């Protein structure tokens, strides 16, 4: 006989991606058709990305990878692409590891699919496919944690 105590969730995978889906998708070419006459290459495309995680159930979360991209040619808006790409994930890890896994690892797994959707979307919209370089979700997470800590410190200083 063994005296070993089973760890809860030890027989389960630490991370399960239950599904991925497009929650919201929008593409606009507000200056069409004139903008295509000015098209002589890839537009300037600043990319805004946000990652959020929302609990759905116990150890069950929706992770959202949101992109907002506004392509410009000679200062004019060529296109606006918005994508809210989500995954439903089950996380079987100790509580202190859940937040980083949801905001670093899950988006890292989702990113290639979202990038492909955006490349197809811009191509089908009449532009060159937008090839987004891999994102550093760990750096994004660190920046978010530092910003939250700075805000908390500022609030504490103001309260005293």
Swiss-Prot record:
TM ranges:
none
**Record's GO cellular component terms:** cytoplasm
InterPro entries under this entry? SecB (IPR003708), SecB-like_sf (IPR035958)
Q: Which Pfam families match?
A: SecB
Predominant location category: cytoplasm
Q: Name one GO molecular function term.
A: unfolded protein binding
- Specify the signal sequence span: none
Q: Quick check: keyword Transport in the entry?
A: yes
- The disulfide bridges present are none
Keyword Transport included in the entry's annotation: yes
Gene Ontology terms: biological process: protein folding; protein tetramerization; protein transport
Source domain of life: Bacteria
Cellular compartment(s): Cytoplasm
Q: Which UniProt keywords apply?
A: Chaperone, Cytoplasm, Protein transport, Translocation, Transport
What is this protein's function per UniProt? Answer: One of the proteins required for the normal export of preproteins out of the cell cytoplasm. It is a molecular chaperone that binds to a subset of precursor proteins, maintaining them in a translocation-competent state. It also specifically binds to its receptor SecA.
The UniProt family comment states: Belongs to the SecB family.
- Subunit architecture: Homotetramer, a dimer of dimers. One homotetramer interacts with 1 SecA dimer.
Q: Provide the protein name.
A: Protein-export protein SecB
Q: Which organism is it from?
A: Rhodospirillum rubrum (strain ATCC 11170 / ATH 1.1.1 / DSM 467 / LMG 4362 / NCIMB 8255 / S1)
Give the classification, highest ranks: Bacteria, Pseudomonadati, Pseudomonadota, Alphaproteobacteria, Rhodospirillales
Q: Name the gene behind this protein.
A: secB
């Amino acid at each position: 006989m063994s005296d070993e105590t089973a760890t809860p969730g030890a027989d389960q995978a630490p991370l399960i991606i239950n599904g991925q889906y497009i929650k919201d998708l929008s593409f606009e070419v507000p200056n069409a058709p004139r903008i295509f006459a000015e098209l002589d290459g890839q537009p300037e495309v600043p990319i805004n990305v946000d990652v959020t995680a929302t609990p759905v159930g116990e150890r069950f979360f929706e992770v959202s990878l949101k992109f907002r991209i506004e392509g410009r040619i000679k200062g004019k808006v060529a296109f606006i692409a918005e994508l809210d790409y989500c995954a439903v994930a089950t996380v079987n890890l100790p509580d202190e590891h859940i937040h980083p896994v949801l905001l670093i690892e899950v988006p890292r797994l989702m990113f290639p699919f979202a990038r492909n959707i955006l490349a197809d979307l811009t191509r089908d919209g009449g532009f060159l496919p937008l090839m987004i370089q891999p994102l550093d979700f760990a750096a994004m997470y660190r920046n978010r944690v530092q910003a939250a800590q700075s805000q908390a410190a500022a609030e504490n200083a103001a309260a005293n």
